[in-house]
């Protein structure tokens, strides 16, 4: 992964933290970028685990969507975040 891409992902992670604040438990890069077999047209898969209920998560969904859209357009990226309750993840 290029230094530029690392910097962009770090910038995106900081934007996530601004949205969810102290509710962020973990932010996980997965998929082709995590495995190292990405291509120039690969998307960037990011999972956001937060300590809030699914109902609370829905209140943040639009803000995450708008921020991601703007970030993708500004940087010619295809970041695809998934926000999940850490409580639900621990059940699996």
Where are each of the predicted segments found?
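Short beta-strand->loop micro-motif that forms the acidic, two-metal-ion catalytic signature
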Residues: 45-49
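Catalytic core of pol beta-like nucleotidyltransferases
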Residues: 1-26, 35-40, 51-92
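Recognition helix of helix-turn-helix/homeodomain-like DNA-binding domains
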Residues: 32
């Amino acid at each position: 992964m290029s230094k530029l891409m690392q910097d962009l992902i770090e910038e995106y992670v900081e934007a996530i933290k601004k949205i969810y604040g102290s509710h962020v438990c973990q932010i996980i890069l997965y998929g082709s970028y995590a495995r190292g077999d990405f291509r120039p047209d690969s998307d960037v898969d990011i999972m956001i685990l937060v300590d809030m209920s699914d109902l609370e998560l829905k209140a943040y969904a639009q803000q995450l969507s708008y921020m991601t859209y703007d970030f993708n357009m500004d940087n010619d990226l295809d970041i695809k975040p998934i926000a999940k309750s850490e409580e639900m993840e621990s059940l699996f």
